[in-house]
Amino acid sequence: ELAHDTATLLEAHRLGIMDAVALKLSKFGGLSATRRARDLCLNLGAKMCVECTWGSDIVMSAALHLAAATDPARVLNVCDLSGYVTPRLAPDAPTREAGRIAPPTGPGLGITVDVDRLGPPDMILE
């Protein structure tokens, strides 16, 4: 639960206290950084939970794809909390059925985001 970057992963491994780790996209700073953390955990022999901290449909789709691209023997679980977040941002987002969930199969993250639900941007960089 306390891991949030490469340094914390390496320190936990050095101390011998990292049998498993929660990789949260929001804590690591997005999908690319979490993928690098996942790769490090694979190299260090740790098992993983792949998730986000109360993420939306968008972030949950990313987490599902990351988990699906990881050796199943190393994934303990994927915690889906997106169903509790409102409003839902993608009508075709994956949902749990009988305790299971799978990544969407469309292009990109596999979902169609309802951009009207996002609201105006806080910042535009040009």
Per-range role (PLM):
Residues 3-100, 104:
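Shared catalytic-loop signature of beta/alpha-barrel
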Residues 88-126:
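C-terminal extensions of enzymes
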